[in-house]
Amino acid sequence: MITRFSVPNLHETTIHLTNVVNGKIVPDKILTNAKILSTYTDTILENKEIWISKGRIACIRNNNDHKNFFNTKDVSVFDVEKNILAPGLIDPHMHIESSMITGCAYAEAALLNGTTTIFCDSHEIGNVLDTDGIEWMLEDCR
């Protein structure tokens, strides 16, 4: 059992985001006037807004839809001035210890190149340092 960090309950998070999408809960922030790169359709979606709550994207809507749900004084609205927003890249398999740098340093380098998610296989440090190595790596990556 890992006790040093907690993961939000998926069911509670889903209910919360559903309530945001339905206008029952005010999102933490809304990004307006966005152009969004769709990697599914290879197109740019224009005049969109993104509702964000608890660090997650709740939904993407047409620009100014939030005015139909919320008083604009109740929500933080940021105009992204028609900048193109794109999803982050995902590194699906890597070994931080093989890179010869710490997890924190690796994350900084990856972010500079657009990678926002990394799945790390930690068997090497686990084989050498057992659970102490895994705990150290988790702590370093925070």
PLM features per residue range, with description:
Residues G23, T39, R61, G88-L89, ...:
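Glycine-centered flexibility motif
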Residues L37, H95, H123-E124:
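Catalytic metal-binding/acid-base residues of hydrolase active sites
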Residues L45, S99, N127-D130:
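Alpha-helix N-cap/helix-start motif
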Residues I2-T14, C104-R142:
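Divalent-metal coordination cores built from histidine and acidic residues
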Residues I50-I57, I96-E97, E108-L111, L138-E139:
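Short, low-complexity, polar/charged sequence segments that are solvent-exposed and flexible
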Residues E49, N62, I101-T102, G133:
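General structural signal for secondary-structure boundaries
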Residues M1-N71:
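N-terminal metal-binding scaffold of metallo-dependent hydrolase/deaminase domains
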